[in-house]
Amino acid sequence: MKVGVYGASGRIGKLLLEELKGGYKGLELSSVFVRQKCETDFSSFSHAPLVTNDLKAFVKACECVVDFSLPKGVDHLLDVLLECPKILVSGTTGLEKETLEKMQKLALKAPLLHAHNMSIGIMMLNQLAFLTSLKLKDADIEIVETHHNLKKDAPSGTALSLYETCTKARGYDEKNALITHREGLRSKESIGIATLRGGDVAGKHTIGFYLEGEYIELSHTATNRSIFAKGALEVALWLKDKAAKKYEISEMFG
């Protein structure tokens, strides 16, 4: 399957190019979208991709777009994909409501998966968080996330997805249960997210379930960003030949 990388100059984008260098499990890098000159030398790649700043040409040259870009970039990408539908794997966080609505429209035309985190470990953490939230009904839930000092969105998309998992399990009001800045006493049906930024931390997420006299913490730490690139490519392989729909990463492993 021919893959196009959107957001190739970013941290994960560069790792995607490296993974696709020799062809990842039969995936071929066919196109790379760049707004400025690309730093990557493609002479050693098994196939020379189209490197372009023409978004339509980029999309037409591939069968699947793997996106790790910025929110505005995803919005522009979706405009083109709605005209020329292709499989979409997106790991970009902080998307606006209008962009998510465009994604839903694309799902009527092509298979896609949008996830805040593509790692297997986070998928398992979500499942454990749901089960623990359901079983420990009296536990207070708090989430702590830590990332590098250049991360733009806060809280992280992964922390918000974990929050959504816990609210669904508990039946909390998703819009009103979130606390990112706390003053005074803790309200019962609330879940706090604490955000830490520093150094070059790839990502750490911890969910605490606090009871009287004891507590449980579930934690995931990313020690190498390559897990996100490899995870995204595994998703691309899984989506091949799937029907048009917006899939959840839990379906892939469930």
Curated annotation (Swiss-Prot):
Enzyme Commission code(s) on record: 1.17.1.8
Q: Which UniProt keywords apply?
A: Amino-acid biosynthesis, Cytoplasm, Diaminopimelate biosynthesis, Lysine biosynthesis, NAD, NADP, Oxidoreductase
The answer, when asked if Ribosomal protein is one of the entry's keywords, is no
Binding of NAD(+): at which residues?
A: 7-12, 91-93, 115-118
- SUPFAM superfamilies per record: Glyceraldehyde-3-phosphate dehydrogenase-like, C-terminal domain (SSF55347), NAD(P)-binding Rossmann-fold domains (SSF51735)
Q: Which GO terms describe its biological process?
A: diaminopimelate biosynthetic process; lysine biosynthetic process via diaminopimelate
Does the keyword section mention Oxidoreductase? yes
Its subcellular locations are: Cytoplasm
UniProt cross-references to InterPro entries, sorted A to Z: DapB_C (IPR022663), DapB_N (IPR000846), DapB_N_CS (IPR022664), DHDPR_bac (IPR023940), NAD(P)-bd_dom_sf (IPR036291)
One Pfam match, given by its short name, reads DapB_N
Q: Where does NADP(+) bind?
A: 35
Q: Where the protein is mainly located, per its record?
A: cytoplasm
Q: Identify its protein family.
A: Belongs to the DapB family.
HAMAP family found in the cross-reference section: DapB (MF_00102)
Q: What is this protein called?
A: 4-hydroxy-tetrahydrodipicolinate reductase
Instruction: Specify the species.
Output: Helicobacter pylori (strain J99 / ATCC 700824)
